[in-house]
Regions:
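Conserved, well-structured core segments that form the ligand-binding/active-site neighborhood
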Residues: 114-279
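Cap/lid and interdomain-hinge subdomains that line or gate substrate/regulatory clefts
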Residues: 10, 26, 42, 50-188, ...
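C-terminal structural cap/anchor segments
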Residues: 283-341
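Conserved, well-ordered active-site substructure
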Residues: 335-336, 344-394
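Short glycine-rich or small-residue beta-strand-to-loop segments that form or flank ligand, phosphate
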Residues: 28-36, 59-70, 181, 238-239, ...
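Short acidic, glycine/serine/threonine-rich loops at helix termini
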Residues: 1, 73-77, 104-112, 162-163, ...
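A structural-propensity feature for long, helix-poor, extended segments
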Residues: 21-34, 287-289, 372-406
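N-terminal basic/disordered segments at the start of proteins
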Residues: 1-24, 42-45, 98-101
Length: 406
């Protein structure tokens, strides 16, 4: 969203060293594996990232989380937001995970995904953060001692001034957070305008679409010829998937009709090294310019069975370790264009590949860009896809988009 709005954007993996200078960019993203980390670790990492960004002269801070508000009763959205509000001394922050282009909307405080209430969208079966309540005021209230209010649709639909006034009233009433309704991109733009003076904004990536214009209006955003331009990198193509979302399962179903697909079976082989070896052996004569797909994705029933045998945390760690090892093996064998499906999977893969920074390019589908990845390993074209994002043909479309770029 920031790149689309004209901001050159670089994403850093993990908290940078204290003495590392910020990259030459209009927006810097510090990516943390904080969604399912222990609360204390998530808070500490987030505060360390904040401190580094403050040292670099950042003007505004954005705590980005999933558009499906992925979290548990313990957090980590509430505890991290609390820590950031306290550290910045701002006393208040809006919370808006809406991303209408990807069918994530908030109405009367209820989050909808794909036209269904969040708890009826498939997210109730998420293997790590099952979402069983669509009322975000309730969900966030369970994660924070701060009071949570609502800026409802009728207010949002009246525009930025009405939104700003409503948030001011909520803060004066002692609310620490405001869930903000949004069902259209126009609403997100208005929310962004209303939050121009806020030190902290929290939400999904969608609400960021309203922010670049604030900086442009303030005269601090330079004109860029093409903020999405990336270096061109040739090499073999591959997809690795760990997400078990309905969207990813549908994308895999489509891919099976067009490219080779290998399915990992951690129920039969609950050993990450063995799963990795089997997948890489299968791929040995298939790596090339045409995509191949290796997936650990499974139905909710299979996920539940694996978790019952191994435990939720161990089952998740097994899949992440296997998929990350497979990605590393594919890169060793010449893959330079890689798509990764799944949020936790993406973090595991980026860590295993030694990725330190991602220059953000143009979008394949809304919310999913190609990036140019660099770090301790080979440079890569890398697309990290949230499990619930992307059209059905995403795994093939991604490489068509790359070929079409000049």
């Amino acid at each position: 969203m920031l790149v689309r709005g004209g901001m050159r954007t670089v994403q850093l993996i993990g908290v940078p060293p204290r003495d590392q200078a910020p990259p030459d960019a209009d927006a810097v993203v510090v990516a943390l594996k904080s969604r399912t980390a222990p609360v204390r670790q998530a808070v500490d990492d987030s505060l360390a990232a904040l401190k580094w960004l403050q040292a670099g002269g950042t003007r505004q801070y954005f705590f980005k989380y999933c558009s499906t508000f992925d979290s548990t009763e313990q957090g980590n959205i509430g505890p991290v937001a609390d820590a950031l509000v306290d550290a910045l001394g701002c006393g208040f922050a809006l919370a808006c995970p809406a991303f209408p282009t990807n069918a994530r909307t908030v109405y009367q405080g209820y989050l909808f995904a794909g036209g269904n209430l969040l708890n009826e969208s498939g997210m109730e079966h998420h293997p790590l953060t099952p979402m069983t309540d669509a009322n975000l005021v309730r969900v966030l209230s369970r994660q924070t001692e701060g009071a949570v209010g609502l800026v409802n649709f009728a207010t949002v639909d009246r525009g930025a001034h009405a939104i700003r006034d409503a948030m001011t009233r909520l803060k004066e009433q002692g609310r620490r957070y405001a869930i903000v309704d949004a069902i259209t991109d126009a609403h997100l733009l208005a929310i962004g305008e209303a939050a121009a003076s806020h030190a902290l904004i929290t939400g999904g990536s969608g609400v960021a679409m309203g922010l670049p214009e604030n900086f442009r209006r303030a005269g601090v955003l330079p004109v860029r010829d093409d903020p999405a331009a990336l270096p061109r990198l040739e090499g073999a193509c591959a997809v690795v998937a760990g997400s078990c979302s309905r969207t990813t399962l549908a994308q895999l179903g489509y891919a099976r009709n067009h490219v080779p697909v290998f399915d990992l079976d951690p129920l039969e082989t609950p050993d990450a090294a063995a799963l990795t070896d089997a997948a890489l052996a299968w791929s040995s004569d298939k790596i090339g310019s045409k995509p191949l797909v290796i997936a650990a994705s499974a139905s909710p029933e299979k996920v539940a069975l694996l978790q019952s045998r191994l435990g939720r945390d161990q089952a998740g760690a097994l899949v992440e370790d296997a998929v990350a090892g497979i990605a590393a093996g594919l890169v060793e064998r010449g893959v330079r264009r890689l798509v990764v499906a799944g949020g936790e999977t993406s973090g595991a893969v980026a860590g295993r590949l030694g990725v330190r920074s991602l220059r953000i390019g143009g979008e394949i589908d809304p919310g999913v860009p190609w990036t140019y990845a660099s770090g301790s390993g080979p440079e890569l074209m890398l697309a990290l896809k949230s499990g619930n994002f992307g059209a059905t043909d995403f795994f093939l479309k991604a490489f068509r988009v790359l070929e079409a770029e000049p």
